[in-house]
Each structure stands twice: as structure tokens, then as C-alpha cells.
């Protein structure tokens, strides 16, 4: 991994600077979930080479031992591909789940008993029975099993199966149209945050985000551990999250549209509209936005996607989101590398002729960011910036450059965090002044052949502490 000695050696003319730049093709980033199919360093490296920039560990599954193995594999893959990779911890969150049971396959028309303890299916949550009423629809897993409540007596309920499948331990349970009062963070979530603070995670996803206070609590815990650099992403997947998405977006570092869980609460035909509205909220608040789940579900078993899946990815790119999240396709699927490769192919195709929608720029720093993006486009120039914290890069990404832009950063922590942003390509050049940071970044890009004779370069930096903006245009001499 890159260290300060390498920075110094590079600046003194030594060629030992080993970080290889990724000459990016896809502007929309790909997040791949790790699991049994993709937990080795070699597979992660292959996924990174064909288009994945960020890797997600779902903390609903496994334990610290299995997570540690995946973290180590990502670090190993970084060495193989010679670039920093984003690493996301997805908290399990407060969710109703089935207890430990023997798997039971249910058939339509049959009846089954849910109980707080015992019964055919154990639901170890009093909150579930407190909101349950006759006629309620209960969904299990991703909605593969649906039931209607026939009667409720205390902590026991009798339900009739509408749609049958296998019911297993730890599957999520949703009462359609109702949200039980659950804790903001579970004890497991807090344990996970302590683990995250000790490892090289760049982002945390807060599952079932319902309020701004929930996001602030996660941020304060990370701050107490000295990890204020970790970006906090709010997953919108419940009706309360949808209702409060504006206030949540104001405090979160990014928004995740969890379409799978939203489909448990809303009619499926409503999901595209909800998705569009959430994306619009995030974009107008200059926050990164990610679409999640079921993009290439058929590739869990098959080596190529369906036509409708290709169209889904295409349309997601056309609304200019920052990243797309693969879940089971790469975690448990038979073709994790091919899945990433297919998603990257569709993204690149969808970008052709894309007319990006740019939000209005109100504050001065946003006007500067938009102006830089448009200046680079008008000059057909390559945009190069230096950012100590990554905030300037986030603002640039908000205005959707139509080709990659390069961000000189002081550390690998900042580089990993920026991987999730639209079109960004972070380059670690060390902690220095803004002027020197730009010099180092452009010099490195020249050495790697990204910048060359005949190129026009727009260079920029912004110091929030000093209130100083630095902008210059250079024509590379032939």
C-alpha cells in the first residue's frame, strides 16, 4: 500500500511510485456484495478489474471472524489491482425476524401459527404481535411467502398462507402497511460499529433509516471511536423513511434506495415513482445516491442477464445515480465476475449520449463546482482537482461531469471514500498544500499517460479554512 516514503520518492524523481491509475470507462460506480461466492482476494480482484469499485459486507450474516476474512481479502485485492477500493459495512438494523426454527415449506390455503415462543414459527418480537390485527398481510423474506392474519390472541396468531414457499430462520418479516416501534440501533449494530472503527471501512449503511436522529447517532458513535472519516449512508426502505427522506438526506452522507424492501411495503407499480422521488431529493441536496437490489437476479443461476434486467440498469444510469448495488448476484451467485462485467457493459452503453440533469447551484461553492464542470466540458478538457477531505470532490460529482475527473487526495482513507462518487478517480499524492497537491496530481497523471501533449487541463482546489479558490487552465505542450 502507498505510504509517505513512496510520495517522497516519487517527488524526488524515483520511479518506485507504484499506484496504477484505473482508466475509467463507467461513470456510474458498481458496488458488489461479498459472500461465499466472492470472498477470496482473487475473485474480488477480478471483479475490481471488470468494473467494481466498492465492496459491501452484509452484517446481517456471519460474525466477526467471517467479516475479518472478507476485509483481509479486499486488502489483498487492493494489492493485486494496485488501487484503493471502497469498503462498505451494511448494518443489520432494527428489523422483525423469524427466530431459530426448523425450515418449513408452506402451501397456499394452509394455516400456520406464529408465536412469541413456540408455535409453527417463532417471532421473538413482542412489537410484531402488538401491531398485528385480523386481515393484515404478512410478508416473509423478499415477499416470497405471503399470509393473511385470521386471528390474534396475545402473543400468538393464526395465519392463512396466500403464497407459499420455504420459511427459514432469520428471514425478515413485514406487516404490510404497518411499522412496529423498534429500537433506533440494536446491540448488534453497536457491536458492528465498534468493529467497523477498527478496520479500513469507508462507508456504513444504516438499514431501515427512519429519522435524522438515527443517522446522527451512528455518526456520533463513529466519532467517539475516532472514525469521523467513515461516510454514513441512509438506506430508505420503509414508509417512515420515505416520508422523512428530506430530513434524513440533510444529515446523511448519501442515500440508498433499497427497492427490495420498499417492495414489501408498497405496491410494486408504485416503486418506480418512489425511486424517482427519492433520487430527486438526494440530487437536489447534492448527496450521492445509490440504487440497490435485484438488478441481475437471474445471474445468480445463469451466465447472462434477462432483457428486462438490462433495461433496468440502463434506465438507472439515465437518471444519473452515483452507484448501483449488486447483492445476492455476487454474494451467492454462480457468476460473480460475469455479473459485474455485464453491469459495467450496460452502464458504459447507457452513458452514450447521456443528457445529465444538474441541480441548481445556490451557494457559492456549488456555483464554483458547477462552473468547473461546465468549463471543462466547454474546453473539452480533463478536470483535475486536489481535495484534502473529499468534500470538494463530492460537490463536483453532484453536477455529473460527462467524463472522469481526477482527485488528488492526502490518504487512502479519503481515496476509498471517494470511490462511490459519480465519475471520480481518486489519486493518493500525500498531505500537502493545495497548490502543491495539484502539482503532484497532474505530475502523476502525466507520468501514467493520462495527461499528454495536446491535452487541455482544468486544475482546481478549494480551501474551506482560508476561503481560497484556485482555478487554472493549462494547455499541454506538444
Model-found features: residue ranges?
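Non-catalytic helical/linker scaffolds that mediate oligomerization, partner binding
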Residues: 5-478
Amino acid at each position: 500500500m502507498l505510504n509517505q516514503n513512496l510520495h517522497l520518492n516519487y517527488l524526488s524523481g524515483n520511479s518506485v511510485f507504484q499506484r496504477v491509475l484505473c482508466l475509467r470507462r463507467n461513470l456510474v460506480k458498481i458496488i458488489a456484495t461479498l459472500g461465499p461466492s466472492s470472498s477470496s482476494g482473487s475473485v474480488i480482484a477480478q471483479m475490481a478489474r471488470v468494473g467494481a469499485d466498492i465492496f459491501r459486507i452484509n452484517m446481517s450474516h456471519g460474525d466477526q471472524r467471517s467479516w475479518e476474512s472478507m476485509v483481509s481479502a479486499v486488502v489483498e485485492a487492493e494489492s493485486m489491482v494496485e488501487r484503493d477500493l471502497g469498503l462498505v459495512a451494511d448494518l443489520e438494523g432494527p428489523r422483525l425476524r423469524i427466530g431459530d426454527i426448523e425450515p418449513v415449506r408452506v402451501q397456499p390455503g394452509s394455516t400456520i401459527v406464529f408465536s412469541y415462543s413456540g408455535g409453527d414459527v417463532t417471532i421473538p418480537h413482542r412489537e410484531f404481535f402488538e401491531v398485528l390485527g385480523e386481515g393484515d398481510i404478512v410478508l416473509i423474506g423478499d415477499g416470497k411467502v405471503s399470509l393473511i392474519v385470521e386471528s390474534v390472541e396475545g402473543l400468538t396468531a393464526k395465519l392463512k398462507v396466500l403464497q407459499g414457499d420455504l420459511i427459514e430462520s432469520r428471514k425478515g418479516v413485514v406487516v404490510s402497511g404497518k411499522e412496529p416501534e423498534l429500537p433506533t440501533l440494536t446491540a448488534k449494530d453497536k457491536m458492528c460499529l465498534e468493529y467497523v472503527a477498527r478496520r479500513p471501512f469507508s462507508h456504513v449503511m444504516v438499514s431501515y433509516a427512519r429519522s435524522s436522529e438515527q443517522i446522527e447517532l451512528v455518526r456520533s458513535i463513529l466519532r467517539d471511536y475516532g472514525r469521523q472519516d467513515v461516510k454514513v449512508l441512509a438506506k430508505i426502505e420503509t414508509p417512515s423513511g420515505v416520508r422523512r427522506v428530506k430530513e434524513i438526506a440533510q444529515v446523511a452522507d448519501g442515500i440508498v434506495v433499497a427497492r427490495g424492501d420498499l417492495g414489501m411495503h408498497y405496491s410494486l407499480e408504485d416503486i418506480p415513482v418512489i425511486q424517482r422521488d427519492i433520487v430527486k431529493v438526494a440530487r437536489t441536496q447534492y448527496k450521492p445516491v445509490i440504487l440497490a437490489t435485484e438488478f441481475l437476479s437471474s445471474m445468480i443461476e445463469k451466465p447472462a442477464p434477462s432483457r428486462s434486467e438490462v433495461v433496468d440498469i440502463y434506465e438507472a444510469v439515465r437518471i444519473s445515480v452515483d452507484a448501483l448495488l449488486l447483492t445476492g448476484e455476487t454474494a451467492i451467485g454462480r457468476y460473480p465476475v460475469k455479473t459485474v462485467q455485464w453491469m459495467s457493459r450496460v452502464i458504459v452503453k447507457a452513458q452514450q449520449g447521456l443528457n445529465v440533469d444538474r441541480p441548481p447551484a445556490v451557494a457559492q461553492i456549488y456555483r464554483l463546482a458547477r462552473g468547473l464542470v461546465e468549463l471543462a466540458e466547454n474546453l473539452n478538457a480533463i478536470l483535475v482537482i486536489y481535495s484534502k477531505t473529499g468534500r470538494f470532490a463530492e460537490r463536483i460529482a453532484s453536477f455529473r461531469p460527462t467524463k472522469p475527473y481526477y482527485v488528488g487526495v492526502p490518504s487512502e482513507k479519503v481515496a476509498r471514500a471517494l470511490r462511490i462518487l459519480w465519475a471520480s478517480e481518486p489519486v493518493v499524492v500525500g498531505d500537502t498544500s493545495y497548490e502543491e497537491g495539484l502539482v503532484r496530481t497532474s505530475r502523476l497523471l502525466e507520468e501514467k499517460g493520462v495527461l499528454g501533449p495536446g491535452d487541455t487541463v482544468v486544475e482546481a482546489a478549494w480551501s474551506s479554512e482560508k476561503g481560497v479558490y484556485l482555478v487554472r487552465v493549462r494547455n499541454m505542450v506538444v
